[in-house]
């Protein structure tokens, strides 16, 4: 279940903390400090020797405080750990989180005062493991999804758990506070384990896991009464959401997602065919299709130079890397976030082909060079 425990070679996602570019893995491996220009590896990041375990990808930096909020998980009780690192890269808070057993969380959400942790009914079949020693992960639709809301610096017993309809969630869009309520938007999977298509032959099982249903969804949790509200916002198949990072943990309206066609719409795997700007309150959207045989990547938001959180939420640019499979040439497309459906305002031809897909991150040039100086 866990990458570090199984000694797996891993592909990596990324994160920034204390001016350092960190290479992270969702199956919980060691965080590695790498050079942002050369990608040279400097070694594991240990927060001055205080980090004694692995770190999952999708740890989050609160830009208002500079704090890194993280979690990790494993095969042994209590199965999850939650923590906070300071803007200086110091481990300032860490608590165990009790789960019913080994789980496969992928992301977390945060607000100015709380962190939202995930416990999904997606875990290994214990009967198969005991009989054959094989780790077969299954979706258990009779088990509720749980979201644990903990004060940012709360103890283990401060977690409040909320039960919701069974599902899986790869990526949170954003979370915020509204009085006694915590609101979380994300791209929900009603059933994360798809049936193989015989037409795919020997690759059927692998392709099935890359052909998933994602739906824009909203959860609301009342910290005072324990009430839960949840509803579908829109069913267009999109994922890999990105928001204006200045709005992380604050009330937001827009998310920039990738359209991934379903099998009945001609989709065969996780290929990003269009960029979609959603209004998350209404489910309305505008869309830009990349074109036949052209596939994109996750599209980070770059705030306009000098923009502040008080400015318009879509005051900035959205960027994506595309590859044309007929020529194997790649470009960086730059969109005005306020007029996405009008198409890119600039195209930058890249000197070599890039693999399409996830994940990407926007980092200001001055932050890149600051990170280099700290290497």
Regions found by a protein language model. Name each.
Residues 1-375:
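Beta-propeller domains
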